[in-house]
Amino acid sequence: RTISQTCPCNLTVLTLGSHNGTHMDAPKHFVAGAKDIAQVPLEKCVGPCKVARFDGLLTAADANRLLADGTKRLLIRGEIEISVEAAEAFAEAGLWFLGVEGMTVGGRDTGTAVHRALLTAEIALLESAVLSAVPAGTYFLSCAPLNMQGLDGSPCRPLLIDFEEKG
């Protein structure tokens, strides 16, 4: 509806999938009986976050290097494919939040296994993030999903605030 003599306001009806655009996967997306998007703890989605650049196949050794400083929230810029072993390393390290630029975290043959490793560990998983203009560094992240019970994912609009911003 639009503003007119009979309607005092604009009102839009949205129809979209839970995995359209930049979105967060809930554990329920790949793990039967797991938490839905409304049950993802918000502290996983808000706080200090490392942005790192990586291209290619991300191995367990690469994952361990990225988390060597104790990072709990990680956004990865670049065209990556996370290996199953890297997903397991992220899970074992206790990572809270992982975001990537691609539409999915795994490869064509490993996507299900990568998702299951990450989501079984209840890592908040962000896909299709727009990070091309974000330099590597540490930021404050705010990336809360919609608070809608039963969903296996949710559109998100991540915000990064530069701790070192001048002015």
Ranges and model annotations:
Residues R1-G167:
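Active-/binding-site microenvironments in catalytic and ligand-binding cores
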